[in-house]
């Protein structure tokens, strides 16, 4: 099974990707995690990616397509995968299609801008594992085994940067949505909008019902 999760920053894609991964034993391919890992390397390419991320711009299509395509095609994903944060543009979507990997489900996570900013203000990351946490929407029990002082704010979670990313997302999502709605007409792909205002648990239940053909 091949699942794609798209949506703006802070809409819960990463959280649901991890939950679905545990439930269905599918590996997560997270563009954000991959790029942040590259950005920590003391290389010219690592510095380039770091500067792009910190500026709030999207990594150019030519670069991100190459990175994700290599990841998808050159590693062992025989049982499928969960693709978190790719594609973000129509060019990326077409390139994913050209890999001839049959995407089964596309979930678009939708959340009002005001709530996106509220969530991002309380979002932290474990710099070692790359796991993202939210102290407001996640239960304390999920964080009790962590030393909170080891968690850090993401460098790209500053207000001006998020504003830029949201503008880019709003510009691209219209075409991306049309692309997958059209694909749904001609292929077995199924496209669903997910209301991210619901709790983590309820969002997860909704997605699982769709995957298990109960909705």
Swiss-Prot record:
Does the keyword Kinase feature in the UniProt annotation? yes
Binding sites annotated in the UniProt record for ATP: 10-15, 123, 132-133, 198
Question: What is this enzyme's catalytic activity, as reactions?
Answer: AMP + ATP = 2 ADP
Q: Which Pfam families match?
A: ADK
GO MF terms here are: adenylate kinase activity; ATP binding
Keyword DNA repair assigned:
no
Region (LID) residue ranges read 122-157
Listed transmembrane segments: none
Q: Which biological processes are named by the entry's GO terms?
A: AMP salvage
Could you list this entry's UniProt keywords, alphabetically sorted: ATP-binding, Cytoplasm, Kinase, Nucleotide biosynthesis, Nucleotide-binding, Transferase
Q: What EC number(s) does the entry state?
A: 2.7.4.3
Show the GO cellular component annotation of the record: cytoplasm
Q: Where in the cell is it found?
A: Cytoplasm
Family (UniProt) = Belongs to the adenylate kinase family.
Role, per record = Catalyzes the reversible transfer of the terminal phosphate group between ATP and AMP. Plays an important role in cellular energy homeostasis and in adenine nucleotide metabolism.
Whom does it interact with, and what assembly results? Monomer.
What remark about domains does the record contain? Consists of three domains, a large central CORE domain and two small peripheral domains, NMPbind and LID, which undergo movements during catalysis. The LID domain closes over the site of phosphoryl transfer upon ATP binding. Assembling and dissambling the active center during each catalytic cycle provides an effective means to prevent ATP hydrolysis.
Protein name as it appears in the record: Adenylate kinase
């Amino acid at each position: 099974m091949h699942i794609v999760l798209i949506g703006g920053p802070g809409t819960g894609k990463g959280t649901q990707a991890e939950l679905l991964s545990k439930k269905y034993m599918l590996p997560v391919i997270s563009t954000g995690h991959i790029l942040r890992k590259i950005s920590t390397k003391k290389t010219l390419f690592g510095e380039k990616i770091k500067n792009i991320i910190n500026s709030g711009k999207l990594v150019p299509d030519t670069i991100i397509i190459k990175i994700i395509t290599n990841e998808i095609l050159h590693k062992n994903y025989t049982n499928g995968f969960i693709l978190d944060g790719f594609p973000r543009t129509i060019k990326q979507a077409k390139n994913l299609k050209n890999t001839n990997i049959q995407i089964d489900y596309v979930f678009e996570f939708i959340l009002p801008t005001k709530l996106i900013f509220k969530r991002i203000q309380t979002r932290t990351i474990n710099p070692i594992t790359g796991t993202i946490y939210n102290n407001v929407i996640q239960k304390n029990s999920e964080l009790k085994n962590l030393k909170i002082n080891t968690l850090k704010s993401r460098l790209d979670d500053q207000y001006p940067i998020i504003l830029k990313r949201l503008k880019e997302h709003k510009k691209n999502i219209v075409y991306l949505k049309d692309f997958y709605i059209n694909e749904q007409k001609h292929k077995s792909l199924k496209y669903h909008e997910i209301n991210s205002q619901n709790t983590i648990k309820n969002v997860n239940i909704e997605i699982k019902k769709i995957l298990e053909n109960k909705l």
